[in-house]
Amino acid sequence: MAEVSMGSSSSSTDLSPEEERVFIRDIAIAAEANSKEGDTFYLITQRWWQEWIEYVNQDQPCNTNDGSSLSEHCDSPGSSTLKKPSRIDNSDLIYDSSLEDPSNTSEIIETLQEGRDYVLLPQEVWNQLRSWYGGGPTLARRVISSGLSQTELAVEVYPLRLQLLLMPKSDHSAIRISKKETIRELHRRACEIFDLDSEHVRIWDYYGHQKYSLMNDLDKTLDDANLQMDQDILVEVLDINGTLSSAHIQSAQENGLVDGDSTSILIEPSKSSLAAAGGFSSSRNAFRTGSVEVSQSFDNTYSSTGVTTRGSTAGLTGLLNLGNTCFMNSAIQCLVHTPEFASYFQEDYHQEINWQNPLGMVGELALAFGDLLRKLWAPGRTPIAPRPFKAKLARFAPQFSGYNQHDSQELLAFLLDGLHEDLNRVKHKPYINSRDADGRPDEEVADEFWKNHIARNDSIIVDVCQGQYKSTLVCPICNKVSVTFDPFMYLSLPLQFNTTRAITVTVFSCDKTALPSTITVNVSKQGRCRDLIQALTNACSLKQSEELKLAEIRNNFIHRLFEDPLIPLSSIKDDDHLAAYKLSKSSENTTLLRLVLRRRDQKAGERESTVQLKPCGTPLLSSASCGDALTKGKIHCLVQNMLSPFRREESVGKKGNSDSSIPERRSARFNNTEEEDKVGGLKKAKKSNSSDLGASKLSLQLIDEDNKTINLPDNEAEAMKLPSSATVTIYLDWTPELSGMYDITCLESLPEVLKYGPTTKKARSEPLSLYACLEAFLREEPLVPDEMWFCPQCNERRQASKKLDLWRLPEVLVIHLKRFSYSRSMKHKLETFVNFPIHDLDLTKYVANKNLSQPQLYELYALTNHYGGMGSGHYTAHIKLLDDSRWYNFDDSHISHINEDDVKSGAAYVLFYRRKSDAGGKMT
């Protein structure tokens, strides 16, 4: 490996790709080793980072989506010679990229996922890359401490955004502040923003527009105060007597900030201990309340979900989404509606809390879950805000802190394990030395293993959810057989791997009479841009004289052209909008012409002179030779040719009515279908006659690549040559007259690369059986090389074959469908539709213990669903209430009836089955 030593001032143009890689690798290693609280990290778009990684590596593809460290990627071999990356462009990470925020507080898009959308770089690495490549905007974020011991470090990508409401002036302001700042700092900043005297100001936790608690513990952090993203903070200004004046109260009443018969007073804490949010305490001080001042009416501050039910059915209370917490809400609802847990946590379970268990959370997690369960089963339909529970969860599992989307199954696994340890009836776990089977009967060995397990693990979670499987290992050399019987909490079943993905592209033709069409093609998930272009070429029957230019459309502009055929398709997101333009094959001296439409954006009351022109619709693309002499009239003809497919019928054009409501306009929308589909309703245009609209009627502005204006000749016949730049942007001001002649409704929005929705009938016609998934899970297979077994007879590690069998099944069987797949080169989600039984899941033949006399039958009562892609999307739950035998959809705070036929879908993720009773086949 070549050693490189140079100052930070070195230009990247002086370095080879290998030297850049080594230089950044060494900086990254040093920075990661010395990271500490208070350091600054910087977000960089995953797309640019991926380009740079591939540029500086030489042997094979490299992808950063594997969770490994930054320095590891700088040691990953790459592939063929690639084009040097252009300027860093982080515009896809923020809402408004028109201006760079000099304070480095640009609003980052809320749904970003690390490793999918961005990479975090230490300050030293960011500074070096930016000095080489330039660009931005700069997105700096602080390192904070997290976890129970506050020793785990994390980058606070999304600081709290709080809405400050000033009473009585009814002013408001939004601020960003770290959750590690104190209430004192929040108080100071509120006074600074509203220009207030701090001695006469107090602030309230005003979550849900109710006074939840007075924030008077100035040294408490905002994290400890359980503040949530985008919640309200009430800022009260008091008079010299410490109260609001009558005039102020009247003003506040008019704005709904206080009740009509009240003044601003301290709200009394809840008198209920166990029913309040974190109100239990013991002589051991094992449970510390998070907030003392709790409003009695807090849980009644939200409107009903509107569910109409028979009688007074309980259990139909929703959970408010605190910001990407649907993953948590769906899992909680399934556990809460498990009958055994509902009964247990509504009774006095506190005597079973294990206060000394070092593997537990000293009872805090169990208490928080039990309190939440009681509220969800209480009478009424008012949605609950699970703030106290989320705070406890984040404290003991920092990976679930913040407001990023997480895996619902990972949350479920942690929660079940945490509840088990908090409720473990075994106070002192004995040491047990497990014996080998040594040829003994399976029944004897299985019972021995189970008794040993129960001697250390005995809780309601074990009683309800844990089963036992038989694991058989066979040495391939000496044939030594090792049999163990291990407990399981859930079964993670593999799904068939799909190596392709569907990508939808809108194709624009160079034929002046052809309308745009949407085409969906299947390509390899690990493919390159050239593979997508080839698939589109085949699908749209491209002529020999034509070529496709593929582009990503964003904010009514061509955000990027996919000119490099080696760009990985993984850089194309499912919610991107792609366009492909059919053009005549170009020579080296061809200039691309981008036609961008822009419309006057006049707001109410705005003066005519200040009205701005804003881009609209989808850009169009054409080409022209740099050597051709073009007149102003020819340029206008080029523009009219690009617009000709959207020309209205002559009768409509003559009327010039821009507000036409003909059916053709109303139906001119793209449909995301599985085959080529012409835009409905628009008539194919007749051959365009450029004389229909004189050149003087088109308002054009030409801009070159350097953002410099290209002056058009005043004389229409005077010839000009296009500059040698690769692209020229033509801005066309869209006028009412043009609207009367052309219908560009279909250009207003393009379909996304992949639209998620209910499973199609085609997908349902050939489903994957849940039994097939189970058989794949139980199938004998060799261990992977990284997990080789130590054979006691050979006294060496061997790649043994492993066979799993079910032996003991739990009362509640949780089945996880492994939709998310991870590898070093990629992450992806499997959209496979799995046909799972609802009423009679029969596992009898899969249980190796043949001494069981009863059939092993289960009935589905709950499941979680995931809609969307990796690291994003949305979770819901389908749950059957056993007391009324009806199915409901739990979508955060909204609950609605669903038919049993709608329970199955391609979104099903975690299934909850309950054992049927012996008599009658019904669940107990």
UniProtKB/Swiss-Prot annotation:
Catalytic activity reported: Thiol-dependent hydrolysis of ester, thioester, amide, peptide and isopeptide bonds formed by the C-terminal Gly of ubiquitin (a 76-residue protein attached to proteins as an intracellular targeting signal)
Any one biological process term the GO annotation gives: protein deubiquitination
CDD domains with a match to the protein in the record: Peptidase_C19R (cd02674)
Pfam family, one: UCH
Compositional bias of kind Polar residues: 64-83
Annotated region described as Disordered, given as residue ranges: 64-87, 648-690
EC number of this enzyme: 3.4.19.12
Compositionally biased region (Basic and acidic residues): 648-667
UniProt entry keywords in alphabetical sequence: Hydrolase, Protease, Thiol protease, Ubl conjugation pathway
Effect of residue 326 to S: Loss of activity
Residue intervals of the USP domain: 317-916
PANTHER family: UBIQUITIN CARBOXYL-TERMINAL HYDROLASE, UBIQUITIN CARBOXYL-TERMINAL HYDROLASE 5
Family named by the database record: Belongs to the peptidase C19 family.
Function: Recognizes and hydrolyzes the peptide bond at the C-terminal Gly of ubiquitin. Involved in the processing of poly-ubiquitin precursors as well as that of ubiquitinated proteins.
Name of the protein in question: Ubiquitin carboxyl-terminal hydrolase 5
